Amino acid sequence: MATLKDIRTRIQSIASTQQVTKAMKMVSAAKLRRAQDSAIQARPYAAKLKEMLGSLSTRVDTTLNPLLSDRDEVKNVLVVVITSDRGLCGAFNANIIKIAQKVVTEEHGDLYRDGKVEMLCAGSKGNDYFRKRGFSISKAYPGLFQNLHFSVAREIAEYASERYLKGEVDKVVVVYNEFKSVLAPVLKSEVLLPITPEKVEGEKTGSSIDYIYEPSPSAIIDVLVPKHLNTQIWRMMLESNAAEHASRMTAMDSATENAKELMRVLKISYNRARQAAITTELSEIVAGAEALQGE
């Protein structure tokens, strides 16, 4: 049975841990607000670029741009995995890694067994996990979220495009966590390349406005495609960053509440042990007094 000193030491230790988790929750809440604002602000721009690409694709031969053209056969795949750099964020990284592993080993199982699936790991956690398990990692960005910058998104997009244009990969998939709300992040697996432009609603029904493009639609597409890829990668990174802070804030809040409950239980145990010790001492005193009276 634990002594009073043991219980008291444990209560003090849990109280110290609770202070840390509470502070981390407050820090994550402050970072979440900024990260959430950045992710939300990036969405309209990314969506508009996608819409413009869809509108232009109806007016040009998309086969003229290789990034818009499907390959007859997918022989090599590049999977981009966006995880965090730090832990203590609940199941955030575990869920992303689970989905990424499924994309690699199940959705592209035959290619994976033939060594035709490569990975690009953005974030330390994913890089550490997949490297230790012998997955083929062609490029990694550990420490990415310690100094998040658009130039890294552009570098990843250019790397993926270059590999696709050279024919070294026939498909690029991105696995990331999309921020929907604090309690409900959404795991996403999206095909980045080849680009499949989405037709806007008016053009689906044939009632689109006849725009005049200057320069030509094909020239605009050649400029728009790299911007689209850069923006999509950047948006995914911002979404993942916001989802990470939300997950960490929730995890630290849960840890703080658990510490509070554990301290409550330990204090009850401490008081009971203290009462038992006092009762034992009183019993010994009474027994001693009775023994003296008997003499």
Swiss-Prot record:
It is a peripheral membrane protein. It comes from the Bacteria. Keywords: ATP synthesis, Cell inner membrane, Cell membrane, CF(1), Hydrogen ion transport, Ion transport, Membrane, Transport. GO terms for molecular function: ATP binding; proton-transporting ATP synthase activity, rotational mechanism. Its main location: membrane. It is found in: Cell inner membrane. InterPro entries: ATP_synth_F1_ATPase_gsu, ATP_synth_F1_gsu, ATP_synth_F1_gsu_CS. One of its GO terms (cellular component) is plasma membrane. One of its GO terms (biological process) is proton motive force-driven plasma membrane ATP synthesis. Produces ATP from ADP in the presence of a proton gradient across the membrane. The gamma chain is believed to be important in regulating ATPase activity and the flow of protons through the CF(0) complex. F-type ATPases have 2 components, CF(1) - the catalytic core - and CF(0) - the membrane proton channel. CF(1) has five subunits: alpha(3), beta(3), gamma(1), delta(1), epsilon(1). CF(0) has three main subunits: a, b and c. This is ATP synthase gamma chain. The gene is atpG.
